Design a protein with these regions (language model features):
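Hydrophobic alpha-helical membrane segments
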Residues: 1-340
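Membrane-helix interface motif
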Residues: 30-46, 145-158, 343-354, 402-412, ...
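Membrane-interfacial helix-loop connectors
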Residues: 75, 79, 375-430
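Transmembrane alpha-helical segments in integral membrane proteins
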Residues: 85-108, 183-186, 380-404, 435, ...
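Membrane-interfacial helix-loop-helix connectors in multipass membrane proteins
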Residues: 149-174, 236-247, 351-358, 409-422, ...
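Hydrophobic alpha-helical transmembrane segments and adjacent short intramembrane/lumenal linkers
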Residues: 171, 187, 410-475
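Final/C-terminal transmembrane alpha-helix of multipass membrane proteins
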Residues: 328-332, 467-491
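Transmembrane helical segments that form the transport core of multi-pass membrane transport proteins
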Residues: 340-397
Length: 498
C-alpha cells in the first residue's frame, strides 16, 4: 500500500522533468545550449574548479559566459520552468490526497481482516474527491499560516525594527493557525474511511473527536511526536554511519504505516487485526482438533525472509518470461533517451575528466556507498514499478530520464573510461531497471483497464502484489550489482585504464 502511495506521488516530478527537458530542447534547437556548455567548460577550466582555487573570492564571470546565460534566460524557457513548478505543486496536492485514501483504506481493511490492496484500490475510486479536498484544505492552511509572516516581512522596507517585530508576531500567529487547523483535521481521513461520510461530515467528526475521546486524541498526538522523534533520531544515526539513505526506507515503509494504523485503529475503536475467519472459529472437539494443526511450528523469521526473497527471484524470472514486451518497451524508451542524450551533449565539446585514482573513487572499504546504492536503486525500481498506477506516466518518465542521463554522460566522457566504470555492474543494474519499468507498464495496463471497465479491482490488486514479489527478487539482483559497483568496478576500471 505504501509503495502504491510512492507510485502516486512519483507523478509530482513528471512536470518538472518535462519542463527541464523542454527547456533544454529549446536551448539545443538554436545552439544556445552548446554555447552555454562551452563557455562554462572554459570558465571552469580557467578557474581550476577541481583544484579549489575558487575557495576565496574567485574569478569574475567572463563576458562570454554572462552573455550565454542571458541568452538562455528567455520568456519561453522561464515560462516552461514556472509552468512545471506550478503543475508539480498542483499534482502534489492531488497525489497526496489519493495516496492518503489508498493507505488509510488499506489499513482499515487490514484491521478488519479484508484484502488491504483491493480495499486501497476501491477506496481511492470511492473517496478520491474527499481526500483530495482534505489535501487542498491542508495546503490552504499552510498558505494561510504563511501570510502573517510574509506581511510582517514586508515591513522591513519601512523599518527593520518594525519588520522584525511584525515578522515574529506573524510567525507565532501563522504557526498557531497551522497547528490548530492540522489538529482539527487529524482524524478527518479516518472518518471518511470508517464512517463512509463526505468531506464535510468527516471534518465535523474529526473536530468532535478530541471532545468525545480526549485521552485517545492526546495519546495519538504523543505517539505521533514519538514516531517523528524516532525518525529524526534514526536519520541522525544513519547519517553518522554514512547510510542516510536508509531513512528513505525506515520512514515511509515502517514508521509512517505504524502511525496510520494507530490512527485508524483508535478512530475505529479497534486494537488489533481481526482475522477474516474469526466468525467461523471452531469450538469443542473441532477446536481441539484444530489446535493440533495450530501447534505446528511456523518457520523462523530468518527462514521466512529467505523464502520471501527466493520466491521473489522465482517471480522475477516468471515475469520476464511472461511479459517480455513490457520489459522490452522499458528498454526501448531507455535506449531512445540515451541516444538523445548522446546527441544533446556529444557536440558541445565538453569533457568530464576521469578521477585520477579510479580504484580509490569510493574509498578503501565503501560499505556506506554499497548501502546507498542498494537503497537508492531499489527505491528507483519501486517508484518506476508502482508509478504504473498513474497510467504508466511516471514509469515512462523514469525510463526516459535515466536513459537521458546515461547518454548525456557518455557524450561528454571518455568512452573507454565510461564503459569501464559502468559495464561491470551495469550488466545487472540496467536490466533490473528495465524490469522495474516493465512492471510499471504491466500495472499501467491494469489501471487503464480498471478505468475502462476491462479489468476488475481484484485483478489490479493481483498485479500490484505480483509487482511487490518481483521487487523482492530485484532487491537480490541490486544487492549483487551494488557489491560489484562499490567493491569491484573501481578496480576493474583501474585495470582497464592502466
Amino acid at each position: 500500500m505504501y509503495l502504491l502511495g510512492i507510485g502516486l506521488t512519483a507523478t509530482v516530478r513528471v512536470p518538472l522533468i518535462l519542463a527541464v527537458g523542454g527547456s533544454l530542447g529549446l536551448l539545443a534547437s538554436d545552439g544556445r545550449l552548446e554555447t552555454l556548455v562551452s563557455e562554462f567548460t572554459q570558465f571552469a577550466r580557467e578557474a581550476d574548479l577541481d583544484g579549489g582555487s575558487m575557495a576565496g573570492s574567485g574569478p569574475e564571470i567572463p563576458p562570454g559566459l554572462e552573455t550565454a546565460l542571458g541568452d538562455a534566460i528567455t520568456l519561453p524557457v522561464v515560462g516552461l520552468l514556472v509552468g512545471g513548478v506550478v503543475a508539480a505543486l498542483v499534482i502534489s496536492v492531488v497525489a497526496n490526497g489519493l495516496s492518503s485514501a489508498a493507505t488509510l483504506h488499506g489499513m482499515h481493511a487490514a484491521l478488519r481482516g479484508d484484502d488491504p490492496v483491493r480495499a486501497a484500490i476501491t477506496g481511492v475510486g470511492r473517496d478520491w474527491s474527499s481526500f483530495v479536498g482534505l489535501s487542498v484544505l491542508t495546503a490552504g492552511l499552510v498558505v494561510l499560516g504563511a501570510l502573517p509572516a510574509l506581511l510582517g516581512a514586508s515591513l522591513f522596507a519601512i523599518s527593520p525594527a518594525a519588520g522584525g517585530l511584525a515578522t515574529a508576531v506573524g510567525v507565532v500567529l501563522g504557526g498557531g493557525i497551522v497547528i490548530v487547523g492540522l489538529l482539527a483535521l487529524t482524524f478527518a481521513g479516518a472518518s471518511v474511511v470508517v464512517d463512509t461520510v463526505g468531506i464535510g461530515g468527516a471534518i465535523g467528526e474529526s473536530i468532535r473527536f478530541p471532545v468525545d475521546r480526549p485521552v485517545a486524541f492526546v495519546g495519538y498526538i504523543l505517539v505521533s511526536l514519538g514516531v517523528f522523534g524516532l525518525l529524526s533520531a534514526a536519520g541522525s544515526l544513519f547519517s553518522v554511519l554514512g547510510v542516510s539513505q536508509l531513512s528513505g526506507l525506515v520512514g515511509p515503509l515502517l514508521l509512517v504505516p505504524f502511525l496510520d494504523i494507530v490512527q485508524v485503529a483508535l478512530y475505529a475503536e479497534q486494537s488489533a487485526p481481526r482475522r477474516r475467519d474469526d466468525a467461523n472459529t471452531p469450538t469443542g472437539a473441532a477446536a481441539a482438533e484444530s489446535d493440533i494443526v495450530a501447534d505446528v511450528p511456523r518457520p523462523g523469521a530468518l527462514r521466512r525472509i529467505v523464502a520471501a526473497f527466493r520466491d521473489g527471484l522465482v517471480g522475477l524470472g516468471g515475469f520476464v518470461r511472461g511479459y517480455p514486451l513490457a520489459v522490452l518497451a522499458a528498454a526501448g524508451l531507455f535506449a531512445l533517451a540515451a541516444g538523445g542524450g548522446v546527441v544533446l551533449t556529444g557536440g558541445t565539446g565538453a569533457e568530464i575528466p576521469l578521477p585520477t585514482e579510479v580504484n580509490e573513487v569510493f574509498g578503501a572499504v565503501p560499505v556506506d556507498v554499497f548501502v546507498m546504492l542498494v537503497v537508492n536503486n531499489w527505491l528507483v525500481s519501486a517508484t518506476a514499478a508502482y508509478g504504473g498506477i498513474a497510467i504508466g506516466i511516471p514509469a515512462a518518465t523514469d525510463m526516459l530520464l535515466n536513459g537521458l542521463i546515461v547518454g548525456a554522460l557518455y557524450g561528454v566522457a571518455d568512452q573507454t573510461g565510461f564503459l569501464a566504470l559502468v559495464a561491470p555492474h551495469g550488466v545487472l543494474e540496467l536490466p533490473a531497471i528495465f524490469v522495474a519499468g516493465g512492471l510499471g507498464f504491466h500495472i499501467a495496463a491494469g489501471a487503464g483497464g480498471l478505468l475502462t471497465g476491462r479489468c476488475s479491482a481484484r485483478l489490479l490488486a493481483n498485479r500490484l502484489r505480483r509487482a511487490y514479489r518481483v521487487l523482492l527478487g530485484l532487491a537480490v539482483v541490486l544487492v549483487v550489482a551494488a557489491l560489484i559497483e562499490a567493491f569491484l568496478t573501481p578496480r576493474i576500471a583501474a585495470a582497464v585504464l592502466g
